[in-house]
Amino acid sequence: MIKGISFQNSVAHEKTDVFRDKVQYNAFIKNELAYARNVPADVNGDAKAGRIRAINSVIEKYKPLENIETAVLIDIMISFRNIEAFKEMLDFIKQMPRYVFETVMVQEQYAFVLNRNGGKAKPTDEVMINEAEAVLRKLETEGKASSETYGIWGRIYKDKFDRAYKSGNTGEAKGQLKKALKYYEKGFEFDPRDAYPGVNYVTCLELLGERQKALRLLPAVEYAVKAKMNRKAPDYWDYATLLELAVIENRFAEAEEFLNEAKPLAIESWMFDTTKGNLNLIMNFRNERNEDIDPIKELILSLG
């Protein structure tokens, strides 16, 4: 619930995806923000800067923020996330009126963007990352946690795992991976319809070599993905998730089919990079266990 905006029976991870379809609010501003998110790239191929300026123009036009309806404020926040303007997203959330800032949805997105900015900082901003975890812990303590809360919490530790793994600190990496698994498990148990913590839970089990447990869980996650695809038009991440699950189960012919379905739905090249990163992890960990990695290598090459 966000000040009169209800997501009854919705999967928590889908709140930001379905928000614009489910919530009635100022149609003119809604269209202005839709245009802002899709401003064409400039002559140098840079679309992001122009889109940020366009969103900021909408904010300037209707501020102060206290006079803007709650749903529009949420759309602005999601718009910054949609275009990956994470610094601007964080700055905007901090300016939100208190009654909006303290809602569960905004607090979850606040934790998400704190972790994203903290992890991308050079050097890593541990203070920001710790604040992200504190936000999620407060939601849990207050009984407001959702599968999305735990999914974001798992992502904090998965990012810590990635940093430790890339720096060659395998001991720390394994410890962080186990913590990520714990929160992804909590998220999927909280709501088995939410495939996001589910697929990450399965992937963590795969990386830790707990294959049998991963295979027992996998059909439930696959069902959750397909159920989501029946609720709304499939997107890139739906097929990418099915691809990853098929790889874990060694169904490589199906994995290739899912890849072919996913490719036309990728609206940004970084989407392929995310999938390649996940597949590379599975491949590297299997290689360390002396397992066959050739089929995974072929899929990675197909991603370009």
Region roles according to the model:
Residues N117-T124, K160-S167, E206-L218, I248-F252, ...:
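Alpha-helical linker/edge segments of TPR/alpha-solenoid repeat scaffolds
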Residues L181, F188, R193-A195, V202-E206, ...:
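TPR/TPR-like (Sel1-like) alpha-helical repeat modules
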Residues D21-S57, P64-R81, Y99-A121, G143-K166, ...:
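Amphipathic alpha-helical repeat scaffolds of TPR domains
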Residues M1-E14:
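Cross-kingdom TIR/SEFIR domain
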